[in-house]
Amino acid sequence: MRVLSVRFRVLLACLALVLPNSETNFLSKERASQVLVRKRRANTLLEETKKGNLERECIEELCNKEEAREVFENNPETDYFYPKYLGCLGAFRVGAFSAARQSANAYPDLRSCVNAIPDQCDPMPCNEDGYLSCKDGQGAFTCICKPGWQGDKCQFDINECKDPSNINGGCSQTCDNTPGSYHCSCKIGFAMLTNKKDCKDVDECSLKPSVCGTAVCKNIPGDFECECPNGYRYDPSSKSCKDVDECSENTCAQLCVNYPGGYSCYCDGKKGFKLAQDQRSCEGIPVCLSLDLDKNYELLYLAEQFAGVVLYLKFRLPDITRFSAEFDFRTYDSEGIILYAESLDHSNWLLIALREGKIEVQFKNEFSTQITTGGNVINNGIWNMVSVEELDDSVSIKIAKEAVMNINKLGSLFKPTDGFLDTKIYFAGLPRKVESALIKPINPRLDGCIRGWNLMKQGALGAKEIVEGKQNKHCFLTVEKGSYYPGSGIAQFSIDYNNVTNAEGWQINVTLNIRPSTGTGVMLALVSGDTVPFALSLVDSGSGTSQDILVFVENSVAAHLEAITLCSEQPSQLKCNINRNGLELWTPVRKDVIYSKDLQRQLAILDKTMKGTVATYLGGVPDISFSATPVNAFYSGCMEVNINGVQLDLDEAISKHNDIRAHSCPSVRKIQKNF
């Protein structure tokens, strides 16, 4: 059988050689139908007893699938091998196309092609990057993966950075996955430690001391910052701090003043505005204590103007007329002119005034000149009826219809001319400059009121109509003793603060008795040119029911007292003593004064200014920029001022606003309760 089989195969080979080339690539129909049929060959008995051998069975001879199974002795390998075996036969048969050889991986010969078939790892089925080795199996293979790879062919990288059992791969910052592995990295500004997992911040400020130039270098985790003081912004191009112009950003509601490192907002206090709590917007200054500002047109105010007369009347009466004046009078003032009468040629005159609270009469006629002061003190703030009447040989003065003085005289006070007595009468003040003609000089200003006047026995003829038509000539219905600042003007004084006997050189000792009607305003200010080197001011506190007392040196607070209730019926006392070495602020109700940490520098600035000329203002500041001092609103309310032991009299001011009352202040308005 073996010999016949061999001969048969040789015959097939010979037949193949003589077949046309067009048929060499294909099996016959009959042969092809038998390829997948398992037929056991008729081998010799000795050959059948041997174990199957690939070389002997399928290379030296042609084998069918059954014979191939004898080699592998299992179906999986046989099923895997035999189709590929047929491919090798087709590729290496004589005259086969080169394309067939290429399909068999270009093995050099049939033996190489067939021997390679049983090795499942050839060609390599595993991923080249991920496999460590390939293990051949029965019609199968097993890829052994390198660390960091997975999959049946080691084709999938393991992302160690997402391993739930080792969060972030154990990296303190960044975990970077790589094919088959991973590594830790640090963010910019950090350096890797030797354990290759943890990161440490890099201190750029120490490594590069000049990295910020003139700014301050501040190390932060992973980076650094170049810091500038408040009000400055870092400029990386010049490595320096540049001032921020906050005013260019429309920061303030009204006036904004930029300065190196900051800015300040100001509101026009003279128009009734103050800086709000946000230090940017402006709001109206509220009334904190309502005063009784009601007036009566029948009450003539004698000190409506700073200088000059309040009212002028001229009488032309029969020559038998004698001078007479009767009126009700109210004042707290101690000195001033009530009325002045004179003839048309100014040769004869009569003065009725108040000195030290008592009635004083001065007169001059063609025969004599006299002055007399007497009677009771009447500057008590109540209404007193005063009458002055010329008799035949004397002048009679009565208060409340009781004679207090009787002045002898020769002749008439005023000489008739052409059958008429022409007389001019001036209320409160002197016409022209006649002070030098007086027997004894007197303050022409008088803060007082008159009513019910009867002049030359003509009643109120001529005067009533004038008084009724002018509101500023009317008196408040009720007043108290004190000086009144209406919140619309100031008074100026010239005060020398230098004390040659004092080692401190200059001294400002101020005592104020105040009853404000608004909680914001300048009480006292020293002005030098366009600057305000010193100011004592009130500001409404945040509570809305109390006030803060502030001492300003130029534009900064040197000392302040917080949350004091000053808007009440009872006046409050305030003291401020300051020289080049120290500052003391005091009130009887609060002792917890807050002083500036920069006080000594502020005092040095003030000391330099006080060596020059300063003007003293009460009730506000003059018409300078309202950025000259943080508070520029006029003070409103009652206030009496003592500076360096001298009680200031507004009648002695260099100038004062017409509406400032020197010796009277409106009473607090009484709130009527409804029951």
Swiss-Prot record:
Residues bearing PTM 4-carboxyglutamate: 47-48, 55, 57, 60-61, 66-67, 70, 73, 77
Pfam families in the record: EGF (PF00008), EGF_CA (PF07645), FXa_inhibition (PF14670), Gla (PF00594), Laminin_G_1 (PF00054)
Origin species: Rattus norvegicus
Residue span(s) of domain EGF-like: 117-155, 157-200, 201-242, 243-283
Residues with (3R)-3-hydroxyaspartate modification: 136
Tissues expressed in: Plasma.
Disulfide-linked positions: 58-63, 121-134, 126-143, 145-154, 161-175, 171-184, 186-199, 205-217, 212-226, 228-241, 247-256, 252-265, 267-282, 449-475
Coiled coil: none
Domain Gla per the UniProt entry, residue ranges: 42-87
The Laminin G-like domain, residue ranges: 299-475, 484-665
Protein name in the entry: Vitamin K-dependent protein S
